Swiss-Prot record:
The EC number(s) this enzyme carries: 1.14.-.-
Record has Cytoplasm as a keyword: no
Reactions catalysed, as given in the entry: uridine(34) in tRNA + AH2 + O2 = 5-hydroxyuridine(34) in tRNA + A + H2O
Family stated for the protein in its record: Belongs to the TrhO family.
Name of the molecule in the record: tRNA uridine(34) hydroxylase
Record PROSITE patterns: RHODANESE_3
Length: 320
């Protein structure tokens, strides 16, 4: 494979995020990189793709800056670019938790668990494993026995915790996310909220899956990623499929966005059912006048109506 995908973050002071972002974007474009990077006064959060040569130059460029000299990159091999464009954007936060009183992970955060320590925590009955990601990420893949917060945005996680404290009180809490950045801030919030014995998987799922000792054990399904790949493997020992097809409940790991642009919900759908149900998550979305699947495939009004009739045979929840 000639391409690589880099995933990284660091909480570090960046005095002028706007200027940094503009200069960084220029460097990335000059080296044919594509991806998404967020920059704020609290640090940097990025994922990008490029050839081995170009990503090596990027890593070298970052390590030459004293602020990022110890920056750790998680690296995946890839067959092509994982992004269509290159964006470097200044933001208020590099991961949006939107707290009234912001958390600085450099001052307060949960204990770091190595992959080996995290595996032991998974085997400990007195430890609660809390997924810090969104529900659609969990539904594609998660650690065995982990709690699934019913959220679609990271910023909703604190409210979920407050409403479900009984699941966490009196337990050791270890949280995890894709690459570790969300847990840095979220675990610090848990500590500030008064929870004791709070930990986090250092380096996230991405690091755990590549660890030569743990080999991704106890992970079921695939890991959702925010790029063109959609998902990647984690468990090197006993792979399983846990995702369930939106319409018929069969094993599925194929995510699409609902064809209704006003919905855009991510659903697990087979190619057959995407065609059958017009790329939509529900009857109402399938009949939406701006259905993108209908437009993309130049479906006639007669054929559109014929496929809408397919919804008569599916569970009631898809008619909402």
């Amino acid at each position: 494979m000639d391409y690589r995908v880099l995933l990284y973050y660091k909480y570090v002071t960046i005095d002028d995020p706007e200027t940094f972002a503009a200069e960084h974007l220029k460097f990335c474009k000059e080296h044919h990189l594509k991806g998404r990077i967020l920059v704020s006064t609290e640090g940097i959060n990025g994922t990008l793709s490029g050839t081995k040569e170009d990503t090596d130059k990027y890593i070298e460029h970052m390590h030459a800056d004293n602020r990022f000299a110890d920056l750790t990159f998680k690296i995946d091999e890839a067959e092509s670019h994982a992004f269509k464009k290159m964006h470097v954007r200044p933001r208020r936060e590099i991961v949006a938790l939107d707290l009234e009183e912001d958390i600085n992970p450099r001052e307060i955060t949960g204990k770091y668990y190595s992959p080996k320590e995290f595996k032991a925590a998974l085997e400990d009955e007195n430890t609660v494993i809390l997924d810090a990601r969104n529900d659609y990420e969990y539904d594609l893949g998660h650690f065995r026995g982990a709690i699934r917060p019913d959220i679609t945005r990271f910023r909703d996680l604190p409210e979920w915790v407050r409403n479900n404290k009984e699941q966490l009180d009196g337990k050791n809490i270890v949280t995890y996310c894709t690459g570790g950045i969300r847990c840095e801030k979220f675990s610090g919030w848990l500590v500030k909220e008064g929870f004791e014995n709070v930990g986090q998987l250092h380096g996230g799922i991405a690091t755990y899956g590549k660890d030569p000792e743990t080999k991704g054990q106890y992970w079921d399904g695939k890991m959702y990623v925010f790029d063109e790949r959609i998902s990647v493997d984690v468990n090197q020992i006993d792979k399983t499929v846990i995702g369930k097809e939106h319409f018929d409940g069969t094993p599925c790991e194929r995510y699409i966005n609902c064809a209704n642009p006003e919905c855009n919900k991510q659903i697990l759908v087979s190619e057959e059912n995407e065609e059958k149900y017009l790329g939509a998550c529900s009857y109402d979305c399938a009949k939406h006048e701006r259905n993108r699947y209908v437009a993309r495939h130049h479906i006639s009004n007669e054929e559109w109506q014929r496929r809408l009739n397919n919804f008569k045979d599916v569970p009631e929840h898809t008619h909402a």
